[in-house]
Amino acid sequence: MTVVIGLTGGIASGKSTVSQMFRELSIPVIDADIIAREVVERGKPAYNKIVEVFGTEVLQEDGELDRPKLGSVVFYNEEKRLQLNKIVHPAVREEMNRQKEMYIKEGMQAVVLDIPLLFESKLTSLVDRVLVVAVKPRTQLERLMKRNDFSEEEATARIQSQMPLEEKVKRADEVINNDGTIMETKTQLEVILKNWNIID
């Protein structure tokens, strides 16, 4: 019986580090962000719908989607953001499900769905267990400023656009505290996976 793990966290909480640790343990990871990029490639159904709704001004000269431009259009406009989500989310969900079923058929011990907005997008029904990667608020802010070269104001706005991390922690089956070293994070992950009978 394959255990489907939903991996999530706050922005800049170090989720990709944990995602990589799963891969090193030979546990397949289905990454929602990668799929979200693939489903809007030129010629795909979601791409065509986006151009229909948002017009050609969200395209680059080569006809591919200009993601930063589209991002700035929807970031400050709730209605447009919801329109975009209505196009992209079903396409992402369908592709994640397709890959998940493939790994289940292969008889994998576990498969990870790496979904940054697992709770916000109401996708918990896709998974059996939820693992949240958490950090202290100050760590999160500093990491995001450094990683994306954001001002404190920009970083705070991005963090506040998501469900608060402490709320995600409350809803999790297990939590990894990612304030420490990589080794400490790895140890926590291994303990959780042993408790879930996924690794020996």
Swiss-Prot record:
As one GO molecular function, the record gives: ATP binding
The alphabetical list of record keywords is: ATP-binding, Coenzyme A biosynthesis, Cytoplasm, Kinase, Nucleotide-binding, Transferase
| Metabolic or biological pathway, per its Swiss-Prot or TrEMBL entry | Cofactor biosynthesis; coenzyme A biosynthesis; CoA from (R)-pantothenate: step 5/5
Query: Is Kinase set as a keyword in this record?
Result: yes
Instruction: Tell me the SUPFAM superfamilies matching this sequence.
Output: P-loop containing nucleoside triphosphate hydrolases
Do you know which Gene3D superfamilies this protein is assigned to?
A: P-loop containing nucleotide triphosphate hydrolases
BP-aspect Gene Ontology terms: coenzyme A biosynthetic process
Please report the name of this protein according to its UniProt entry: Dephospho-CoA kinase
Which organism does this sequence originate in? Bacillus cereus (strain ATCC 10987 / NRS 248)
Upper taxonomic classification of the species? Bacteria, Bacillati, Bacillota, Bacilli, Bacillales
Gene (name only): coaE
